[in-house]
């Protein structure tokens, strides 16, 4: 409804400006400031004041007088507030919003666009446990994929596996070279990546500390592995594959805890084995931007504003990561309409070089999008696993669950619902709230901004946190359960002697809402699909987190001012129950976009 209302506002305002012989290229339609009573506003008067030769408030009044609201489904009235032109919907807007949202558990999802998108995210090198500093990638990437699905795209989630670089050659050599007795200490966890990472650390330490002759011999073995991969040697692929698949299996278990799941794990060696990497290198050599310098083939990308050359082939004819990634991206373009990649800020140059080179090769890079993120820090400072130190994602999730469990148990006496929570219930809530707190705190920030993760903020039930917004959903569920127990019809379900049955839409009247709190909440419900559309267009899932906080504020005001089950007015009570159902669906789906559980009780 909000999307249609916005479209009607644009049409009406455009017609008004045209009738005044004023430009219509920038309508300035936006959400009004919080202290302004309007659903949409236009700041166009600021832009036109100079052209008209009058003060913005006077221009706004002239424009408002020229707006004709006749013939629109939702646009009903126009007025001004200083320099702003304000637009107001009629009753049908609220009626249709309540009808659509109260009975549709999938409310907010947009129609199918018949457009395929591949979202590549996480793609951490399979060299050991997932480090907490990289936790932003799977969390943001999963939210981007969810968001695009809600926006009507056909989405595949991919993890690009770096199984061809030097790190994996070193890992494979170390795994074959050393025995358990050579390793220091026990694995930090009983899982494959924690076990095998000890070989990787041992190998790197050996290469730094062993005598020069031993290191030279080791480097020859490592080089042979790399050459074997380039030559397509099946035995080498099997040797490397054993290490990669074992470590990756453990990493999958960690990521499943978030959860972050994938449709396909695409291996880098795939594009060496099928010849596409060689094809990329050959095509690049033929371009006017290719030069052979410093014993390597390079691309000069000055025409794209990039000072640093892209090295795409070494002197021994071995390819580099970016060369293989170019083949990978052309494969994406062959199989999907769009491609989105979530990358850490240290890959920004690589992303720019990739875009420029893909364009040089004749690809339409408008089909490619990047989400660049900064890293997650703990209060102690930046973390690194280069030496095998630091906090792992598993550690963060464990502590989140423990802290959430403690918070839930502390708040047991403050619960409004009179149901008894079992130990299993407490454990379930601890997982939903704890992991939700981590995900929400990370995804709620603009990706480009660095994060310092603070427990006090992430688990604050009264603050701008996951528990704060999750509690809205739990409250909705509690009210709807109470209504059903009292024999009150609930949109979608009602209680009878046989249990719970589907009853579809109810006969409720949204025009009976007499308080601003109810109308304001319904306005928030109405704009959810538009929030999905805008966030998907900009690849900004953090704006949905902002929506949940604003929605929670609106719901809590309604909760304080509008009794639902205890209302004496039957018609008003039915409408409020429907509004609670609409709020439940809206919050559940907003949280689903963010990958955060929506608890039924807390």
Curated annotation (Swiss-Prot):
Belongs to the class-I aminoacyl-tRNA synthetase family. SMART domains: Arg_tRNA_synt_N, DALR_1. It is found in: Cytoplasm. A motif ('HIGH' region) lies at residues 124-134. It catalyses: tRNA(Arg) + L-arginine + ATP = L-arginyl-tRNA(Arg) + AMP + diphosphate. One of its GO terms (molecular function) is arginine-tRNA ligase activity. HAMAP family: Arg_tRNA_synth (MF_00123). GO terms for cellular component: cytoplasm. Pfam families: Arg_tRNA_synt_N, DALR_1, tRNA-synt_1d. GO terms for biological process: arginyl-tRNA aminoacylation. It comes from Halorubrum lacusprofundi (strain ATCC 49239 / DSM 5036 / JCM 8891 / ACAM 34). Its EC number is 6.1.1.19. Transmembrane segments: none annotated. Keywords: Aminoacyl-tRNA synthetase, ATP-binding, Cytoplasm, Ligase, Nucleotide-binding, Protein biosynthesis. It comes from the Archaea. This is Arginine--tRNA ligase. The keyword Nucleotide-binding applies. The keyword Manganese does not apply. Signal peptide: none annotated.
């Amino acid at each position: 409804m909000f999307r249609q209302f916005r479209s009607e506002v644009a049409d009406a305002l455009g017609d008004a400006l045209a009738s005044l012989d004023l430009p219509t290229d920038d309508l300035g339609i936006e959400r009004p400031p919080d202290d302004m009573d309007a659903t949409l506003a236009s700041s166009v008067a600021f832009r036109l004041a100079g052209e008209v030769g009058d003060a913005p408030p006077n221009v706004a009044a002239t424009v408002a007088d020229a707006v004709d609201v006749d013939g629109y489904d939702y646009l009903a009235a126009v007025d001004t507030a200083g320099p702003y032109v304000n637009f107001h919907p009629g009753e049908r807007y609220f009626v249709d919003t309540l009808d659509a949202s109260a009975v549709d558990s999938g409310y907010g999802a947009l129609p199918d666009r018949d457009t395929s998108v591949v979202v590549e995210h996480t793609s951490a090198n399979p060299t050991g446990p997932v480090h907490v500093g990289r936790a932003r990638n799977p969390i943001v990437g999963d939210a981007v994929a969810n968001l695009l699905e809600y926006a009507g795209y056909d989405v595949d989630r991919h993890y690009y596996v770096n199984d061809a670089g030097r790190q994996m050659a070193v890992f494979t050599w170390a795994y074959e070279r050393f025995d358990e007795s050579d390793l220091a200490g026990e694995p930090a966890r009983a899982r494959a990546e924690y076990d095998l990472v000890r070989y990787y650390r041992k190998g790197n330490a050996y290469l730094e500390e062993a005598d020069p002759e031993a290191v030279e011999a080791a480097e020859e073995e490592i080089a042979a592995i790399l050459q074997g991969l380039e030559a397509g040697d099946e035995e080498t692929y099997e040797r490397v594959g054993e290490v990669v698949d074992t470590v990756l299996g453990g990493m999958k278990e960690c990521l499943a805890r978030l959860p972050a799941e994938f449709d396909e794990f695409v291996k880098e060696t795939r594009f060496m084995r099928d010849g596409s990497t060689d094809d990329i290198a050959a095509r690049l050599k033929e371009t006017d931007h290719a030069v052979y310098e410093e014993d390597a083939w390079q691309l000069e990308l000055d025409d794209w504003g990039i000072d640093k050359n892209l090295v795409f082939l070494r002197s021994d004819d071995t390819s580099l990561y970016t060369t293989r990634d170019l083949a990978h991206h052309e494969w994406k373009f062959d199989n999907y309409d769009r491609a989105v990649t979530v990358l850490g800020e240290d890959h920004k140059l690589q992303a720019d070089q990739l875009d420029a080179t893909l364009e040089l090769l004749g690809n339409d890079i408008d089909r490619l999008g990047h989400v660049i993120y900064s890293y997650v820090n703990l209060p102690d400072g930046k973390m690194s696993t280069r030496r095998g130190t630091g906090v792992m994602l598993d550690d963060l999730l464990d502590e989140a669950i423990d802290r959430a469990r403690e918070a839930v148990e502390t708040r047991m006496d403050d619960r409004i619902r009179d149901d008894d929570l079992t130990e299993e219930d407490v454990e379930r809530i601890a997982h939903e709230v704890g992991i939700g707190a981590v995900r929400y705190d990370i995804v709620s920030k603009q990706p480009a901004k660095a994060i310092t993760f603070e427990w006090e903020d992430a688990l604050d039930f009264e603050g701008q946190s996951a528990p704060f917004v999750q509690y809205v959903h739990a409250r909705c569920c509690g009210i709807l359960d109470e209504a059903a127990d009292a024999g009150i019809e609930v949109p979608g379900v009602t209680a009878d002697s046989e249990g719970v049955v589907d009853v579809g839409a109810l006969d409720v009247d949204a025009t009976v809402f007499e308080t601003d709190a109810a109308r304001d909440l319904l306005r928030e419900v109405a704009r959810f699909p538009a929030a999905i559309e805008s966030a998907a267009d900009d690849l900004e899932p953090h704006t949905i987190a902002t929506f949940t906080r604003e929605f929670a504020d609106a719901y809590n005001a309604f909760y304080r001012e509008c009794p639902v089950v205890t209302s004496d007015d039957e018609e008003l009570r039915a409408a409020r129950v429907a509004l609670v159902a609409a709020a439940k669906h809206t919050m559940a789906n907003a949280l689903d976009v963010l990958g955060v559980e929506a608890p039924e009780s807390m």
